[in-house]
C-alpha cells in the first residue's frame, strides 16, 4: 500500500490542522577562497485553521578555481616518452531550488494537499591545458526540474494521489586539443563540438482503499499507474561541421507500469502484529511486456521497551 518494493520507513508527523501557527527561517552565507561563493535559504510555514502553507527557496551563486600538474616518463619499446602538462579550470554556477505546498482539512480524515517543487541550475566551466599537450574545453549545462503532487484523502479510507514530473538537462561542450611528439611536431589534433539533452516526463497516479474491521483486522487494496517518457540525444561535430556517427546517438523510450494489490493486517495483541499482501504488476517497454507477482509479509513483535523482533519477506 506504500507503493515501494523492499524496506521502507513510514514517518507520520503531527497534524496542526485547526491551529494558528507561523514560523520561518532565513539563512545566508559567504565563502571566500580564490573566488567567492554565496548562498541563501528561506523557509516559511503557516497554519490558519483548516488551511496550511509551506514555502521554501534556496539560492547558490559562485565561482570555483583549480589547478593541477602532471609529470610522467613512460617506457615505449626501447625508448622513454616524457610527458608533462599543467591544467587550470574555472567554473561558474548558479542554482535555484524552490517549493510551495498547500493543504486544506475539510474535516477529520478529509484532506487535500497540493505541492510544487522546482529546480533551475546553470553551470559553465573553462579548462585549459599547456605542456606536452595543449587543449581548451568549454562546457555549458543547465538543469530544469518541475514536479507537482496532489493528494486527496476521504473519511471512508480512500486515498487518491497524482503526480507529474518533468526533468530536462541540455548541455553544450567544445574541445580543442593537440598532442605533440618529442620533436615538437603535431601528433594528434582534436576539434570537437558536442551537444546533448535528456528529457524525462513522468505521470503517476494511485488509488488506495483501507478498511478497519472488527477484532483488529484490516483490509487494503489499490491500484497504481505510471507512464514515463525518456528522450535523449547526443551529437558530435568535427571542426568542419560534419557529424561523427560513432559519437552521435538518440534514445526515445516510453514505459508503462500497472500495479494492483490486495492485503490484510491483524493486530493480534498489544505486542504482536502481522501484515501481508500480494501485488500483480505489468511492466511495458519497447522490449519488455510482462506480468509479475510480488507477495510480501511483515510480522512485528514488541518484546519489551528495549527489544523488537521484525520478520519481513
Ranges and model annotations:
Residues 27-29, 86-88, 134-136, 193-195, ...:
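Short secondary-structure boundary micro-motifs
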Residues 45-47, 64-77, 125-132, 171-183, ...:
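Extended intrinsically disordered, low-complexity coil regions enriched in Ser, Thr, Gly, Ala
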Residues 3-5, 249, 305:
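A short, structural micro-pattern
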Residues 168-170, 284-287, 301, 305-313:
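Surface-exposed extracellular loop regions of Gram-negative outer-membrane beta-barrel proteins
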Residues 97-121, 138-290:
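Face-selective signature of the C-terminal outer-membrane beta-barrel domain
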Residues 1-126, 137-169, 208-220, 298:
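Membrane-proximal, glycine/serine-rich, low-complexity loop/turn segments characteristic
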Amino acid at each position: 500500500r506504500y507503493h515501494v518494493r523492499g524496506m521502507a520507513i513510514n514517518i507520520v508527523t503531527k497534524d496542526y490542522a485547526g491551529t494558528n501557527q507561523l514560523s520561518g527561517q532565513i539563512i545566508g552565507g559567504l565563502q571566500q577562497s580564490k573566488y567567492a561563493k554565496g548562498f541563501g535559504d528561506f523557509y516559511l510555514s503557516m497554519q490558519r485553521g483548516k488551511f496550511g502553507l509551506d514555502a521554501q527557496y534556496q539560492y547558490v551563486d559562485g565561482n570555483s578555481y583549480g589547478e593541477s600538474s602532471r609529470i610522467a616518463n613512460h617506457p615505449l619499446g626501447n625508448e622513454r616518452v616524457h610527458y608533462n602538462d599543467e591544467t587550470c579550470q574555472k567554473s561558474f554556477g548558479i542554482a535555484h531550488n524552490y517549493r510551495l505546498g498547500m493543504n486544506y482539512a475539510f474535516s477529520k480524515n478529509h484532506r487535500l494537499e497540493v505541492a510544487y517543487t522546482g529546480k533551475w541550475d546553470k553551470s559553465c566551466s573553462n579548462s585549459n591545458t599547456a605542456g606536452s599537450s595543449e587543449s581548451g574545453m568549454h562546457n555549458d549545462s543547465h538543469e530544469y526540474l518541475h514536479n507537482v503532487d496532489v493528494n486527496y484523502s476521504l473519511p471512508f479510507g480512500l486515498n487518491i494521489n497524482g503526480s507529474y514530473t518533468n526533468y530536462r538537462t541540455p548541455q553544450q561542450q567544445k574541445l580543442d586539443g593537440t598532442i605533440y611528439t618529442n620533436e615538437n611536431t603535431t601528433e594528434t589534433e582534436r576539434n570537437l563540438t558536442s551537444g546533448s539533452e535528456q528529457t524525462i516526463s513522468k505521470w503517476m497516479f494511485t488509488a488506495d482503499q483501507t478498511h478497519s474491521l472488527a477484532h483488529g483486522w484490516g483490509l487494503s487494496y489499490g491500484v497504481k499507474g505510471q507512464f514515463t517518457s525518456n528522450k535523449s540525444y547526443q551529437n558530435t561535430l568535427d571542426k568542419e561541421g560534419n557529424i561523427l556517427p560513432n559519437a552521435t546517438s538518440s534514445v526515445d523510450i516510453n514505459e508503462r507500469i500497472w500495479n494492483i494489490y490486495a492485503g490484510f493486517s491483524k493486530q493480534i495483541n498489544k505486542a504482536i502484529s502481522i501484515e501481508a499482501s500480494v501485488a500483480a504488476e505489468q511492466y511495458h517497454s519497447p522490449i519488455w511486456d510482462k506480468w509479475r507477482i510480488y507477495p510480501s509479509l511483515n510480522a512485528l513483535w514488541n518484546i519489551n521497551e528495549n527489544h523488537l523482533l521484525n520478520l519481513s519477506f
